Amino acid sequence: MQFQRRSLMIFLLFIGYAIVYIDKTVVGFALLPIEREFSLQPEQLGYITGVFFLAYSIFQIPAGWLNDRFGFKKVLCSSLFLLGGFAMCFGWLGFTFGLLLTFRFLAGMGHAGYPTSCAKAVTANFPVEQRTFAQSILLSSAGLAMTLGPLVAVYCLEHIGWRGSFASLGILAFIISGCILWLVPNPQRTLPVSSPQQQSVPYRQLLKSPIVILLFIAIFCLNIPSYGLMAWLPKFLVQNRGLPLGVSSLVAAAGGLGMWISSLCTGYFVGKYMQGKEHKVVCSCSLLSAVCIGLVYATSSAISASLFLFFGYVFLMASFVSVFTLPMKRLPTDVMGAAMGIINTGGTLGGFVAPIAMGYLVKMSQGYFSTFVFLVVVMIVSGLVILPLAGKTYSPVREAA
């Protein structure tokens, strides 16, 4: 019975995560018709994507506190409901550049609670030895979304337009939110917090932890190429490499497939064979991913680009899963929402910086060479910054309690 309950919860959280990632995937392809409709400059397109992650970053830590205070189920449902509502507004009411920015910002605010509440749900319902695999299943939804998302996005853009695509996505988010509300059991009650001062102590100590800081930087660097490619790869392939939109969706889908496979395999492999050696996994995979990302730019063949992007995302996701699951092994449950909020804020800041920085680089250089150099460099940094964790023994009781 417990296995069935956990399986149902993971399935629903997985579908919700997929909706969240499809929302971010569709934007990259929707920028092409949006650019034509509003006659936008490259840096303005970057802001449409980046402002989503700005809101995501701002509300990430408050969302972690809400998880610790009110429970993961309420935050899960609220996040999907807000994300769906503002996705619909983006499609139906986004008639000016300012409104597009506003609705994407508000959607990012809604999205902020979902990753931390999923991490809280996994921590509360799974033993330590199963958490890496359970979380990797949820993170693999990114691969599913990036595999099917480009294909679905191009189909929807061609048949119902970018406005109808976002409206449909919002309806799906509403449906999944209702299913979670109805089918996922309520979390066990914990003792109420007696005062704000008592709750603030773990936050201050977590912010001083060198391990939390290093994980924050690593996630920041890893998400720059992840979200930067998600936002700009379709435009690069169509306008710079001259590929049809349908072919560019297949190239992007190859990267998503690599991400999906890697997230599932990495969770099992690291959880079973590489306990305590995660820094080696992160460093080696980050360097290999940097090489593959550089080769995506160097090739002019759609098949070669698909192959390099596939392996680039295989190694990138291996690094990401290893970094993202480390706090679940080292931190106590009562501060998990807060810790994941802090660390994941690094990732969302990477998502904010990446599309805007790439937009300015494209405009200033009138090309994409400098943008890919930027992606390669931050990928290398993500691997090197994790090396100081080698040999460290982290005690959550001493550092975070």
Protein language model regions, located:
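Extracytoplasmic gate region of multi-pass secondary transporters
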Residues: 27-28, 210-264, 320, 324
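C-terminal ends and interior cores of transmembrane alpha-helices
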Residues: 81-95, 287-300
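C-terminal transmembrane helical hairpin of 12-TM major facilitator-type secondary transporters
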Residues: 276-323
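Helix-to-loop junctions at the C-terminal end of transmembrane segments
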Residues: 60-71, 263-276, 362
